Amino acid sequence: GPSRLYDHAAFKWNDNRRQSPPLSGAILYEMHLGTFTSGGTFDAAIERLEYLSELGVTNDELMPVVEFPGKHGWGYDGVALFAVNDLYGGPDGLKRFVDACHAHGLGVLMDVVYNHFGPVGNYTTKFGPYLTGRHCTPWGDAVNFEDSGSDEVRRFFCDNALMWMRDYHMDGLRLDAVHEFM
């Protein structure tokens, strides 16, 4: 399928000295980017950050923003977990959003889904034992975190988590439905 290269070093961050707000006593705003503004993009959401600050919000928790099939969705059926959804503004849009949040004193947490893949467009099983039938979730076979071949599967998800923190300056991750891991 289609793919592209992205140079993370080309983006010029302004938040080099950012300090994440403490999570103790935090006031989170869970944001579905596609419905937060009429534009449904990172850039449109930047225009409303002052409003969140005025509400007393300390951390913005983004619902999943990875690529998913179709034009509308909650993001919980992601299939390209390393790709920021282009409809929202792609990698640069997310970086501008995080940079702007930090400029407003807002931390950014990202909701990640590591317990299942979306039902359409998931090709990970063609490349390795990403799923196991030993345990099923409400969405189908569970992700293989414990069976044969699971070392590389775990590395895939660890690399993904590190990418969000390192390359997108996330202040934390919220793991969806951890009770479904095993």
Which residues make up each language-model segment?
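Substrate-binding/active-site clefts of carbohydrate-active enzymes
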Residues: 11, 16-23, 28, 32-182
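Extended acidic/polar, glycine-enriched regions
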Residues: 1-6
